[in-house]
Amino acid sequence: MRGTDEKYGLPPQPDSDRMTRRTLPVLGLAHELITPTLRQMADRLDPHMRPVVSYHLGWSDERGRPVNNNCGKAIRPALVFVAAEAAGADPHSAIPGAVSVELVHNFSLVHDDLMDRDEHRRHRPTVWALWGDAMALLAGDAMLSLAHEVLLDCDSPHVGAALRAISEATRELIRGQAADTAFESRTDVALDECLKMAEGKTAALMAASAEVGALLAGAPRSVREALVAYGRHIGLAFQLVDDLLGIWGRPEITGKPVYSDLRSRKKTLPVTWTVAHGGSAGRRLAAWLVDETGSQTASDDELAAVAELIECGGGRRWASAEARRHVTQGIDMVARIGIPDRPAAELQDLAHYIVDRQA
């Protein structure tokens, strides 16, 4: 029987392995651990900015009324906690690091929505769509500032190293986002460039999440390096799956319009691979990408035909296989260092969740 995963270009998995059908315990625990401190940090903001950040984080509606909304997956905080546990520490000791990476991640989302002019995230209007460009910029900046503050408030002797890891990852994230933006006006984006962009835009913060957890736990260098490599691999897998969902994801699950990435003519990984290796389908896709006459006005039927070009050219299957290859490599990296059974299993679960998710 064909599984749901095939709909997204992913090989069917046994029902017992479909982690996208349930919330991983480690993700639920991550939410529980970071929320009190995350709220305390948001309370430091001024009365103009606090409700905007509260809305984006899923705690309130646009009028400031409390809601229990989808506030994200918490994959990066979970990775901080599991990395700390893998190094033999109590996960609670890594709360400042987990809150920090979650704030950096959300800073990037608010700015990304603004730059892409995306009007919906997590089934709600985005910050810029409600409050305008200026407030969206400031909300993102505010969360980035809080990401530094929460670490500086920590009394760990490893705060300096953790803060450096966060800052370097943020710089890499900005580099990747800048490349992604530059690609919009180019017609000759190479696959290697697209992969380098994904390493900065997505994988850098995943790797830093693992590194921060290990640093705050005082892990030896060999453990830190293995966890960082794991984070980088699952970060690339995450971006590959994100790109698949940006074309074939179901709007009622992703919270974004159908064919959202194609409508914006984004040079995503499956698109770029198809252009380079997809034969006649790739050539037709390349011609469509440079044809600006229908930009932003393409019908769903036209976009469905473009998605079919990517399918026929092999981009969908390549992205799926590449995501699973990175997951396997990431798991192999941590298997070599002999960490305790529970965090080892949690790292495997996180990796498989990333490729099996539907949003």
From Swiss-Prot:
EC number, as in UniProt: 2.5.1.10
Pathway field: Isoprenoid biosynthesis; farnesyl diphosphate biosynthesis; farnesyl diphosphate from geranyl diphosphate and isopentenyl diphosphate
The UniProt record lists the keyword Nucleus: no
pH-activity profile: Optimum pH is 8.
Compartment(s) of residence: Cytoplasm
Misc: This enzyme is unique in that it is the first reported eubacterial E,E-FPP synthase that does not have four amino acids between the aspartate residues of the first aspartate-rich motif (FARM) and that has the features of the archaeal chain length-determining (CLD) region.
Family: Belongs to the FPP/GGPP synthase family.
Cellular component aspect of the GO annotation: cytoplasm
Keywords from the UniProt entry: Cytoplasm, Lipid biosynthesis, Lipid metabolism, Magnesium, Metal-binding, Transferase
Cofactor: how bound: Binds 2 Mg(2+) ions per subunit. Mn(2+) and Fe(2+) ions also support activity.
GO molecular function: (2E,6E)-farnesyl diphosphate synthase activity; dimethylallyltranstransferase activity; iron ion binding; magnesium ion binding; manganese ion binding; prenyltransferase activity
Protein activity control: Dithiothreitol increases the enzyme activity by 2.5-fold.
Protein name per UniProt: (2E,6E)-farnesyl diphosphate synthase
Motif placement: DDXXD motif: 112-116, 242-246
Organism, scientific name: Mycobacterium tuberculosis (strain ATCC 25618 / H37Rv)
Residues where Mg(2+) 2 binds: D112, D116
Positions with a binding annotation for (2E)-geranyl diphosphate: R121, K201, T202, Q239, K256, K266
Chain residues that bind Mg(2+) 1: D112, D116
One of the Pfam families matching this protein, by short name: polyprenyl_synt
Biological processes per GO annotation: farnesyl diphosphate biosynthetic process; geranyl diphosphate biosynthetic process; geranylgeranyl diphosphate biosynthetic process; isoprenoid biosynthetic process
Database matches in SUPFAM superfamilies: Terpenoid synthases
